[in-house]
Regions:
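An N-terminal assembly and electron-transfer interface module characteristic of large anaerobic redox
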Residues: 1-132
Length: 132
């Protein structure tokens, strides 16, 4: 009998960023994984990881489902606490997924800054000796 991969999916952002883009990315990227990986058990986090309490609850959910791997999508900029906490508590590899930045127009702000966050998070995970 073939064993099914249990993939934990979570979208993150730091609380000071607007939440509309992270919510959109959570639906879009979570839906993409479910549609394109039918042979995988995609365990979608019950909430977006934007606070310590939310991350604790997500870890418990992922432990209950015995996830083998985590895919973390940057809904917007996320400090290195989220990726570090997930990998330390779950002890599974993590895929850091930084979507393209929303088009930037003069006199407005960045809405995600995901690539910057992903690079910073990868450096932190490397220092911790975690697989990403």
């Amino acid at each position: 009998m073939k064993k099914k991969l249990h993939l934990g999916f979570v979208t993150t952002y730091s609380g000071r960023w607007p939440k509309e883009l992270p919510e959109q990315r959570d639906r879009e990227y979570g839906g993409w994984l479910e549609k394109n990986l039918p042979e995988v058990d995609v365990v979608k986090a019950g909430q977006i990881g934007c606070t310590s309490q939310a991350l604790e609850e997500i870890v418990e959910q992922f432990k209950e489902h015995s996830v083998d791997l985590v895919v973390m999508v940057y809904g917007a900029f996320t400090g290195d606490d989220a990726a570090a906490y997930l990998t330390e508590m779950l002890d599974v590899p993590i895929i850091l997924w930084a979507p393209y930045e929303v088009p930037f127009e003069k006199n407005t702000r960045l809405y995600a800054n995901a690539l910057c966050a992903m690079t910073m998070n990868a450096a932190s995970l490397r220092r911790l000796g975690k697989t990403y």
